[in-house]
Amino acid sequence: MVYRKSENGLIAGVDEVGRGCLAGPVVACAVILTENLAIPGDSKVLSRAVRLSWYEEIISNSYNAIGMSSVKEIETMNILNATLLAMERALERLPVVPTTVLIDGRDIINNAAKYKEVKSVVSGDKIYGEIKAASIVAKVTRDRLMEGLDLTYPYYRWKFNKGYGTKEHLEALAKYGVTDHHRRKFAPVKRMLLR
């Protein structure tokens, strides 16, 4: 396979999913795409069926790796630092070291000096195929994780809300309380604990 390059070498795109959730880990993905793969959009604009189809295509035609930060890490270091840690873990798990790293958003990873070029790109998931691909793989991975947790905790309907603060999730929190998978320092969960 031939992988996309900049003048500096291999390009990795990085994106995360789950930063604003009330439950579950934050999941990041790093992707180095093959030259012939043109990703149509990021995970937020694709239907579930299209996203799953592209997930399989990306997994088969890229170097890719997942990094996660647990609820405990989110609670200990805050969501921003936990997100950056998940991104760093994803990059470190790639089977090759990219030269250029493109990160969706405004933040730069703490170990940026390891790479020749690191750029944060606001709305990068609308611009760069590598970031679009990373968003798709991260979302499908996290969605599957939350669907698995839903089997043990069906009251919270994580299969549907993926841990976000939907009305039904908040109602379940009020009725059934907080689990070990909830982020206790996030305001809606914290309010439930103070009741």
UniProtKB/Swiss-Prot annotation:
Name of the featured protein: Ribonuclease HII
Cofactor, how bound (note): Manganese or magnesium. Binds 1 divalent metal ion per monomer in the absence of substrate. May bind a second metal ion after substrate binding.
Gene name per UniProt: rnhB
A Gene Ontology cellular-component term: ribonuclease H2 complex
Family: Belongs to the RNase HII family.
Single GO molecular function: manganese ion binding
GO term, biological process aspect, one: DNA replication, removal of RNA primer
Subcellular location: Cytoplasm
PANTHER family recorded: RIBONUCLEASE H2 SUBUNIT A (PTHR10954), RIBONUCLEASE HII (PTHR10954:SF18)
Bilayer-crossing regions: none
InterPro entries: RNase_HII, RNase_HII/HIII, RNase_HII/HIII_dom, RNaseH-like_sf, RNaseH_sf
